[in-house]
């Protein structure tokens, strides 16, 4: 009845972007006794915890360009003001992550390029030590790139995410697709008989959720509601099916869906002109006509009555067009024909 073959691709979600590490708290640095009398100029300052500073100072406070090696093996090279990182600088963490960009009052803030030890790279805005504003994030693991807005270290706002299998253009929230968006699939990258081509609709917490339209390579198209990535609720499904002669017949089902499949309840099914059938309007169960319904055939035959498992069954009226006249027949508990 509703012979629909739909392979659902695994939803590809962006990996969480790497968090920016905190820099060392410079208030923890204490000068050794022999360095306390140094006041101004370009000097080397030694600290009691195996760290050192080489650069300019003013009244014993770091100011201007300098190099600071910290007790945890982090290193900073750049501008200082009033003993704090301030201006352009490069901060290298002991694990290999590198921040190159702006600092303000000891905090990473402004524009920067951050290279992570896992190969990921971020270029864009930074606020209060976190990715913020417009930026570009390249993920080595997924061979993907995100170009868009960030907030609180996460992809949030409008952006474009792309890898070898698909391109998403839309809204994000806390690193996940959330809001209106468009997915463009690259079908040659999917090992599927009928790969997807495009999805336009709503997302929630990384899943297709809400109204949307999804199209497939063979012409199949679903227009309706989604819940957590699956067809759920009211929708319309248009799909082609090749017959024995190689001709493509189009069917259109409108009704209720549950867990990706046509569900129990009222719906309608329309066939293309190439088939024997015209339309069905009535009740469905398990993808078959069940309950009350009306079936029309292209030869003029109509049946209005009860169905069971896709066949005439129970009370109903059958109108058959025979040459120049129509016969009306009442039937009860009689199997007339199976609808293919």
What are these language model-derived features?
Residues 1-340:
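Intrinsically disordered, low-complexity repeat tracts enriched in Gly/Pro/Ser/Thr and acidic residues
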């Amino acid at each position: 009845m509703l012979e629909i073959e739909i392979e659902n691709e695994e939803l590809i979600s962006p990996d969480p972007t790497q968090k920016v590490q905190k820099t060392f708290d410079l208030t923890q640095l204490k000068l050794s006794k022999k360095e306390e009398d140094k006041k101004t100029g370009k000097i080397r300052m030694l600290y009691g915890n195996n760290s050192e500073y080489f650069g300019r100072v003013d009244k014993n406070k770091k100011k201007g360009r300098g190099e600071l090696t910290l007790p945890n093996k982090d290193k900073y090279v750049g501008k200082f003001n009033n003993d704090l990182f301030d201006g352009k600088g490069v901060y290298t963490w002991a694990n290999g992550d590198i921040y190159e960009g702006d600092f303000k009052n000891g905090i990473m803030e402004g524009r920067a390029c951050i290279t992570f030890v896992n190969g990921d790279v971020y270029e864009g805005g930074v606020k209060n030590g976190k990715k913020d504003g417009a930026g570009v994030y390249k993920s080595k693991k997924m061979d993907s790139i995100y170009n868009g807005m960030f907030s609180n270290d996460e992809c949030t706002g409008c952006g474009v995410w792309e890898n070898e299998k698909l391109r998403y253009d839309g809204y994000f929230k806390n690193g996940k697709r959330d809001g209106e968006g468009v997915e463009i699939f690259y079908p040659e990258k999917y090992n599927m008989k009928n790969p997807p081509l495009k999805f336009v609709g709503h997302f929630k917490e990384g899943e297709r959720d809400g109204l949307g339209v999804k199209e497939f390579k063979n012409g199949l198209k679903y227009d309706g509601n989604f819940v957590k990535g699956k067809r759920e609720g009211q929708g319309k499904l248009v799909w082609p099916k090749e017959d024995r002669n190689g001709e493509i017949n189009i069917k259109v089902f409108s009704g209720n869906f549950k867990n990706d499949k046509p569900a129990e309840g009222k719906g309608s099914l329309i066939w293309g002109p190439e088939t024997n059938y015209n339309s069905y309007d009535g009740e469905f169960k398990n993808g078959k006509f069940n309950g009350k319904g009306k079936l029309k055939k292209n030869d003029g035959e109509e049946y209005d009555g009860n169905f069971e498992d896709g066949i005439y069954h129970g009370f109903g009226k059958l109108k058959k067009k025979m040459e120049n006249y129509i016969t009306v027949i009442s039937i009860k508990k009689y199997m007339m024909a199976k609808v293919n």
